[in-house]
């Protein structure tokens, strides 16, 4: 079983001088999911969307080319891709010759698919920087905070209502989210968005819950799945989508999305201003 302890993460390694797909390191999703009660049947659909800012290769005449790219790793793949290994892998193209950029795209797609154990879509370019027009920022709340971990789902609740329960659709966001790499301890900063339809969720409790990740060590993808599970179990929305847009490290940022229904709950694809 592949775990992060056997990866290059947290180790000093030389940058590759030649193309090497064996640098890619898969980590089983099952390990983290077992810890939060997720079995073989997933309660969500979604993807891990990677933005790559440092991609370079040589054309047929030896002239360097540069590009940005977006990778879409399906959340039902058996493996997630460890970030430092992906950085090193992409850097291994710096002296590789391609007659066409399309040949490079196909090569990357094939290698990432082999690592993840499922089809990974690759495209050149990045989504625009933006934000949702109807988002409600939780950062505006005037609250006292004393709990920074471990993640505490007891903060999550619905707003108390009298008589008939009113159903609402809301998109709640916070830029205050922080978790930590489970191997190196480095901070991982993100903007987190929760979109739902159901009985109103208590905003202050959700913000406190987000901040309770501040000392928590877990991979990006696992944090989002933990949030999804906790909100679904504690607040019981009819529809739910959770997305985190993590800030860039090593020329990459990752944006895990988990949603109850891909058709009914597509979130706008954009980059956070901090990315």
From Swiss-Prot:
Q: Which UniProt keywords apply?
A: Cytoplasm, NADP, Oxidoreductase, Queuosine biosynthesis
Q: Which residues bind NADPH?
A: 83-84, 249-250
A GO cellular component term found in this entry reads: cytoplasm
Q: Where in the cell is it found?
A: Cytoplasm
What is this protein's function? Catalyzes the NADPH-dependent reduction of 7-cyano-7-deazaguanine (preQ0) to 7-aminomethyl-7-deazaguanine (preQ1).
Q: Which family does this protein fall into?
A: Belongs to the GTP cyclohydrolase I family. QueF type 2 subfamily.
> What is the organism lineage in this UniProt record?
Bacteria, Pseudomonadati, Pseudomonadota, Gammaproteobacteria, Lysobacterales
Binding-site list for substrate: 81-83, 220-221
Give the species.
Xylella fastidiosa (strain M12)
List the active site: 181 (thioimide intermediate), 188 (proton donor)
The biological pathway it contributes to is:
tRNA modification; tRNA-queuosine biosynthesis
**Subunit and interaction comment:** Homodimer.
Encoding gene per record: queF
Q: Name one Pfam family in it.
A: QueF
Listed GO biological process terms: queuosine biosynthetic process; tRNA modification
Cited SUPFAM superfamilies? Tetrahydrobiopterin biosynthesis enzymes-like (SSF55620)
Q: What is this protein called?
A: NADPH-dependent 7-cyano-7-deazaguanine reductase
Extract the NCBIfam families matched here: QueF
Q: Name one GO molecular function term.
A: preQ1 synthase activity
Asked if the record carries the keyword Cytoplasm, the reply is yes
Annotated transmembrane regions: none
E.C. numbers: 1.7.1.13
């Amino acid at each position: 079983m592949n775990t992060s302890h056997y990866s290059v993460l947290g180790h000093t390694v030389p940058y590759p001088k030649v193309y090497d797909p064996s640098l890619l390191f898969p980590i089983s999703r099952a390990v983290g999911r077992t810890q939060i009660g997720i079995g073989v049947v997933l309660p969500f659909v979604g993807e891990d969307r990677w933005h790559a800012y440092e991609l370079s290769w040589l054309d047929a005449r030896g002239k360097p080319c540069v590009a940005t790219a977006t990778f879409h790793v399906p959340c039902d793949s058996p493996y997630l891709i460890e970030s430092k290994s992906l950085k090193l892998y992409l850097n291994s193209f710096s002296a590789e010759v391609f007659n066409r950029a399309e040949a490079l795209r196909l090569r990357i797609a094939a290698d990432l698919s082999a690592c993840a154990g499922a089809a990974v879509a690759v495209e050149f370019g990045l989504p625009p920087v933006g934000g949702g027009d109807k988002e409600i920022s939780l950062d505006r709340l005037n609250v006292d905070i004393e709990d920074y971990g471990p993640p505490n789902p007891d903060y999550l609740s619905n707003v108390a209502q009298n008589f008939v329960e009113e159903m609402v659709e809301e998109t709640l966001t916070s830029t205050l989210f922080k978790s930590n790499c489970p191997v190196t301890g480095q901070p991982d900063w993100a903007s987190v968005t929760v979109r739902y339809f159901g009985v109103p969720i208590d905003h202050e409790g959700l913000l406190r819950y987000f901040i309770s990740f501040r000392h928590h060590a877990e991979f990006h993808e696992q944090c989002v799945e933990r949030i999804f599970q906790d909100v679904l179990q504690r607040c019981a929305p009819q529809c739910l989508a959770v997305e985190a847009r993590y800030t860039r490290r090593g020329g990459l940022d990752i944006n895990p999305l988990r949603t109850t229904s891909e058709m009914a709950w597509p979130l706008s694809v954009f980059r956070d201003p901090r990315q």
